[in-house]
Regions:
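Low-complexity, intrinsically disordered regions enriched in charged/polar residues
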Residues: 9-12, 44
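Enriched for short, Lys/Arg-rich terminal
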Residues: 2-4, 12-27, 60-67, 71-91
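PIN-domain endoribonuclease scaffold, especially VapC-family toxins
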Residues: 27-34
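Short alpha-helical linear motifs
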Residues: 31, 52-55, 70-74
């Protein structure tokens, strides 16, 4: 099954920031986004289902400082990426 990956405005800004200021994070984020197309619950970046106030969201590690936060909508076969910088502060 192939998912549509939708980036929030914040996630788009984060990706542009990585492209300008952190090329390694940019490359890793692109690899993670490519994986989300086919298997959003498994793969690299240690996918983790979040709990408590972020229940329903998933996280993947870009590096020690940054996490990709996303929500999977299986009914519409979509993955909504909420943010990519820092640890869960913009969700």
């Amino acid at each position: 099954m192939k998912y549509d990956v939708i980036l929030s405005d914040i996630a788009q800004d984060d990706l542009r920031y990585f492209k300008r200021n952190a090329p390694n994070c940019y490359k890793k984020a692109l690899r993670l986004l490519a994986e989300l197309l086919t298997h959003p619950e498994t793969g690299t970046g240690k996918p983790e289902r979040l709990r408590y106030n972020l229940a329903g969201y998933w996280s993947r590690r870009i590096n020690e400082e940054h996490r990709m936060i996303y929500r999977i909508n299986g009914e519409q076969i979509e993955v909504h990426v909420m943010s990519m910088r820092y640890h869960y502060v913009k969700v």
